[in-house]
């Protein structure tokens, strides 16, 4: 027994004792580190993680490292270094680390969001981008799909005139239906129990990811029961059952003559691979139902909560800045009026609205810290050595709140994104990467930007979004998780009088 214990302790020491680095190499400055636990005891325990890592830059600089268990992580907090990691050396840092909770979420690194660099990730990312290309023109045009759901949302909100409501559920339904149409050409009804189940699953997953889970740091702890891991497994099982039911129905009716959604793209790729009618990168084994399910789950997971959260952040900031809201509505009235639906081309005339959206994405980035990257080869950042297998995290919060790049970064100032005349959009700083960049950038960036503009222009065209009668303004402190969520709040819905008059006039003419 004592021999076994000794072997066990020696094994732990080998795994977790800091390794000797190449003597000639120059590495990022590191937080203090202890055997077994690494830097865990030296990391701030209170407050929001992204803000804590930003504050550590005051002592350690814009690039520093720390150890958690046996893993070394490098934190990046400056746009030049971030762009080197994401763009200049994007392929070298295109890996993803194995993390216990995310392995469950991604079915052991399937899909695209959490998949490691390799043939599977490259194939599925390419197929997802091909699917988005389906929605550029015609009846499947993305703008048309978004406007359909925006109209349904607005029609529902019109029934809530004079009421103070939480926008979460109606917004989530609208955005879920857009994602569902892209994946399956399928939409949910408001009373559909599957819709509520999907929302509950997403909430459960984000709740788990918002917690610090020791198993993610010390994989050896998997031998012990974990309530968080069990909850994650339950959420993923429910999610997979719901999506698999839809997937199987779509497979029954699939024909290669009509490719109209993401699932069709994935199924056609599998047919081609099975028939040896595909390139060497399309291995049929990488296109199993489990692989397809993981990719579709990624699109749902990334596409719904992110957009819903950003729209709620925009509404919250407008409630805090009513004069800005009025100016945006004035520009909508002057440039669009009430007799047509806003279009993407209206960005050119609704520059204040677009600047407001961009400022919200800056001051409250939906992912304050990008999903960790991993060095797939020995590399460098600046003049510092980065060993193969090192995790690299870009602190987007630090980039977006750098005082040297942004004047008074904690103030909400949409004018940052406008020229001095207020008539042209500008890019005021390279320290702005709301959707990431490079090989691992957000595949749904175009979709998200269109959703944000079309939903907000439609809402402000039809409604006055007001502070509830109790005078309670939304908190601007977020709930950190994989997504920076706003705390629940209510907004009073009032149909605009000018909209009512325009509709009445149109019905009598």
Swiss-Prot record:
According to the UniProt entry, how is activity regulated?
Regulated predominantly by intracellular cAMP levels. The 17,20-lyase activity is stimulated by cytochrome b5, which acts as an allosteric effector increasing the Vmax of the lyase activity.
What subcellular locations does the record give?
Answer: Endoplasmic reticulum membrane; Microsome membrane
What is this enzyme's class at the first EC digit? Answer: oxidoreductase
Q: Name one GO molecular function term.
A: iron ion binding
Where, in this chain's numbering, is substrate bound? 202
Q: Which GO BP terms sit in this record? A: glucocorticoid biosynthetic process; hormone biosynthetic process; progesterone metabolic process; steroid metabolic process
InterPro entries of this UniProt entry? Cyt_P450, Cyt_P450_CS, Cyt_P450_E_grp-I, Cyt_P450_sf
Q: Report which reactions are catalysed by this protein.
A: a C21-steroid + reduced [NADPH--hemoprotein reductase] + O2 = a 17alpha-hydroxy-C21-steroid + oxidized [NADPH--hemoprotein reductase] + H2O + H(+); progesterone + reduced [NADPH--hemoprotein reductase] + O2 = 17alpha-hydroxyprogesterone + oxidized [NADPH--hemoprotein reductase] + H2O + H(+); pregnenolone + reduced [NADPH--hemoprotein reductase] + O2 = 17alpha-hydroxypregnenolone + oxidized [NADPH--hemoprotein reductase] + H2O + H(+); 17alpha-hydroxyprogesterone + reduced [NADPH--hemoprotein reductase] + O2 = androst-4-ene-3,17-dione + acetate + oxidized [NADPH--hemoprotein reductase] + H2O + 2 H(+)
Give the CC-aspect GO terms: endoplasmic reticulum membrane
Its Enzyme Commission number(s) read 1.14.14.19, 1.14.14.32
Q: Which pathway features in its UniProt record?
A: Steroid hormone biosynthesis; Steroid biosynthesis; glucocorticoid biosynthesis
Q: Which Pfam families match?
A: p450
Q: Where does heme bind?
A: 442
Its cofactor is: heme
Which keywords label this protein?
A: Endoplasmic reticulum, Heme, Iron, Lipid metabolism, Lyase, Membrane, Metal-binding, Microsome, Monooxygenase, Oxidoreductase, Steroidogenesis
UniProt keyword rRNA-binding, yes or no: no
Its family remark reads:
Belongs to the cytochrome P450 family.
| Biological function | A cytochrome P450 monooxygenase involved in corticoid and androgen biosynthesis. Catalyzes 17-alpha hydroxylation of C21 steroids, which is common for both pathways. A second oxidative step, required only for androgen synthesis, involves an acyl-carbon cleavage. The 17-alpha hydroxy intermediates, as part of adrenal glucocorticoids biosynthesis pathway, are precursors of cortisol.
User: This protein is called what?
Assistant: Steroid 17-alpha-hydroxylase/17,20 lyase
Q: What species was this sequence derived from?
A: Capra hircus (Goat)
Q: Which gene encodes it?
A: CYP17A1
């Amino acid at each position: 027994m004592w021999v076994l214990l000794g072997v066990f302790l020696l094994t732990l020491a080998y795994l977790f004792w800091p390794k000797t680095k190449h003597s000639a190499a120059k590495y990022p400055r590191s937080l203090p580190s202890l055997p077994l636990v690494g830097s865990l005891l030296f990391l701030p325990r209170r407050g929001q993680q992204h803000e804590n890592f930003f504050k550590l830059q005051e002592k350690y600089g814009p690039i520093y490292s720390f150890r958690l268990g046996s893993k070394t992580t490098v934190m990046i907090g400056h746009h030049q270094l971030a762009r080197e990691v994401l763009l200049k050396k994007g392929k070298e840092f295109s890996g993803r680390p194995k993390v216990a909770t995310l392995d469950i979420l991604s079915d052991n690194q399937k899909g695209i969001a959490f998949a490691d660099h390799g043939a599977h990730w490259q194939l599925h990312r390419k197929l997802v981008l091909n699917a988005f290309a389906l929605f550029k023109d015609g009846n499947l045009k993305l703008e048309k799909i978004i406007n359909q759901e925006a109209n349904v949302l607005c029609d529902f909100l019109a029934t809530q005139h004079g009421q103070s409501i939480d926008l979460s559920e109606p917004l989530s339904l609208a955005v879920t239906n857009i994602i569902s149409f892209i994946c399956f050409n399928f939409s949910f009804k408001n009373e559909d129990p599957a819709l509520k189940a999907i929302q509950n699953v997403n909430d459960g997953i984000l709740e788990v990811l918002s917690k610090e889970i020791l198993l993610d740091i010390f994989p050896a702890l998997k031998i012990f029961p974990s309530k968080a891991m069990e909850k994650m497994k339950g959420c993923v099982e429910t999610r997979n059952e719901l999506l698999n039911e839809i997937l199987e129905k779509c497979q029954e009716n699939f024909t290669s003559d009509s490719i109209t959604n993401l699932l069709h793209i994935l199924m056609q790729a599998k047919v081609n691979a099975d028939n040896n009618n595909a390139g060497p990168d399309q291995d049929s084994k990488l296109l199993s139902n489990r692989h397809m399910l993981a990719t579709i789950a990624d699109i749902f997971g990334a596409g719904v909560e992110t957009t819903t959260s950003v729209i709620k952040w925009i509404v919250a900031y407008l409630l805090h800045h009513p004069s800005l809201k009025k100016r945006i509505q004035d520009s909508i009235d002057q440039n669009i009026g009430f007799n047509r639906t806003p279009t993407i081309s209206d960005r050119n005339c609704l520059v204040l609205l677009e600047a407001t959206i961009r400022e919200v994405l800056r001051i409250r980035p939906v992912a304050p810290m990008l999903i960790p990257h991993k060095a797939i080869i020995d590399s460098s950042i600046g003049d510092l050595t980065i060993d193969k297998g090192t995790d690299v995290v870009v602190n987007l919060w630090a980039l977006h709140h750098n005082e040297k790049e942004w004047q008074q970064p904690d103030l909400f100032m949409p004018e940052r994104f406008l020229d001095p005349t207020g008539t042209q959009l500008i890019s005021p700083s390279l320290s702005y990467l709301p959707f990431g960049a490079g090989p691992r950038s957000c595949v749904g960036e175009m979709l998200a930007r269109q959703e944000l503009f079309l939903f907000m222009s439609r809402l402000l065209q039809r409604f006055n979004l007001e502070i509830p009668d109790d005078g309670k303004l939304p908190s601007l402190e977020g709930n950190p998780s994989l997504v920076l969520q706003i705390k629940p709040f209510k907004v009073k819905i009032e149909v605009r009088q000018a909209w009512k008059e325009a509709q009445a006039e149109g019905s009598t003419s």
